From Swiss-Prot:
Major place of residence: plastid
Gene: ycf21
GO cellular-component term (any): chloroplast
Protein name as catalogued: Uncharacterized protein ycf21
InterPro entries reported in the protein's UniProt record: Chorismate_lyase_/UTRA_dom_sf, Rv2949c-like
Source organism, top-level taxon: Eukaryota
Keywords, sorted A to Z: Chloroplast, Plastid
Listed transmembrane segments: none
Protein localization: Plastid, Chloroplast
Ribonucleoprotein found in the keyword field: no
UniProt record similarity statement: Belongs to the ycf21 family.
Pfam families registered for this protein in UniProt: Rv2949c-like
């Protein structure tokens, strides 16, 4: 899935204190974009509903000669019974790491790590805000759309790069 995206704001140097103090970013987005916990857990708190994952696809890009260059791309929608599309997420994994750690592709990544009691952390690389006609159609909602991308670490090693785009409807749950 590719989107034409017109960016109206982004930051690639994530200094949480600068974002916390930025009065132009609504509090709800600060919590969602910079939260240290699982978005799945945050969305359940915000919406008072259990989240579900709509697994779109998992695609394997492989190079049999160089297994370390082989990777998996997983795309999902995360939502609730009343709002099926709260977030679009695309994650990129090294095949070995994916097969070793993540055994339930129908489960949200954050939920899996929390239930497994695995210690992980994320390093946010970019937060962005913008408009996209394709996203407006997919989310059935007018923009702008907030998003982020980050690296997920386990035992100090990078295991996944994750891109997330959030529905503007999340602002309605404040």
């Amino acid at each position: 899935m590719t989107f034409n995206f017109v960016s109206c704001w982004n930051t690639k140097r994530i200094l949480p204190n600068q974002i916390y103090r930025n009065g132009s970013i609504p509090i709800i987005w600060k919590v969602i974009l910079l939260g240290d916990g699982s978005f799945t857990r945050h969305s359940e708190i915000l919406t008072y509903a259990i989240t579900s994952v709509d697994h779109l696809n998992t695609f394997i890009y492989s190079n049999e000669q160089i297994l370390l260059k082989s990777f998996i791309n997983r795309k999902v929608w995360i939502g609730t019974n009343t709002c099926k599309k709260l977030i679009f997420a695309s994650s990129w994994w090294n095949i070995k790491g994916y097969e070793k750690l993540y055994k339930y592709p129908s489960q949200a990544i954050g939920s899996f790590f929390i239930q497994s009691e695995l210690d992980f952390y994320r390093d946010i690389h970019e937060i962005f805000l913008g408009y996209s006609f394709e996203l407006e159609k997919l989310f059935s909602s007018k923009g702008p759309f907030w998003g982020r991308h980050y690296t997920l670490f386990y035992k100090g090693k990078p295991i996944s790069i994750i891109y997330e785009i959030f529905s503007p409807l999340l602002e309605n749950f404040q």
